[in-house]
Amino acid sequence: MDQFSTLTEQEFTTFAMTHPAGNFLETPEMKHLLERRGWHCEYVGVKREGQLIAACILSKKKVKIGYAFDIDGGILMDYTDKKCIEAFFTGLKKYVKKNDGLYLTFTPNKQICLRDFNGGEVEKVNQETFDYFTSIGFEHQGFDVHNFDGAPRWLFVKDMAGLTEEDLWKSYGKDAKYDIKKTWEYGVTTRELRYEELPLFKKLTEETSARRNFEDKDLAYYQAVYEEFGERAKFMVAELNFATYLENLHEKLRKLQETLNEVNEALIANPKSR
């Protein structure tokens, strides 16, 4: 019989690290991060004859007259196993109600529509799972690409497995190739920031959020991510190397001057070709 229950951190970690749908949102590090941000979190899941077959992080936060519950990036389970799904959500509903839950938001790590490079619809997938969620009371919040208050609803994923550098270059569109060539020309380099440089990262995200109209996190959040995830979290910046940029400009000027000299020499030798 499938049984919904709370889990230990060791049970969850062992299961999540080997699950094909595992992701950073469903890790002990994320649970600890959420708790530092004021959420209370539990590991919950479903066991079948003592064997764990589904798991996720269930978070809750106090609101005016109860608690708001949230699952982000889960549930780690086989969505084709109907008995498991039913056991999970039946148990989850009881758990949320027992713990004064006002509402539950759920962002599954599950595709609903595949799209091409330009955003055009290719194929709808997992419709049966989607229909099941709505049948038990969930309301879909739509596919707004501009405003979101949590996990983004649209993701761009590029499979680079087995690609050589040449293959990868050929896969880029014309605009992408142009932009990359410009970064080479300008001497743009990337590097990983140290913990003490996170205020610089915060300054960049703050300016970008104001320009692009999205809500930024505070510095304490980025510091907590760095502390909890350690080497698994990468804070990267792109920087313009002015010395390299100037050198490239001088080289471009030199080549242009060579071309100009060749043209002038040709005109002197053949004045009537003007």
Labelled PLM ranges:
Residues 66-148, 256-258, 263, 268-274:
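Acyl-donor binding region in acyl/amide transferases
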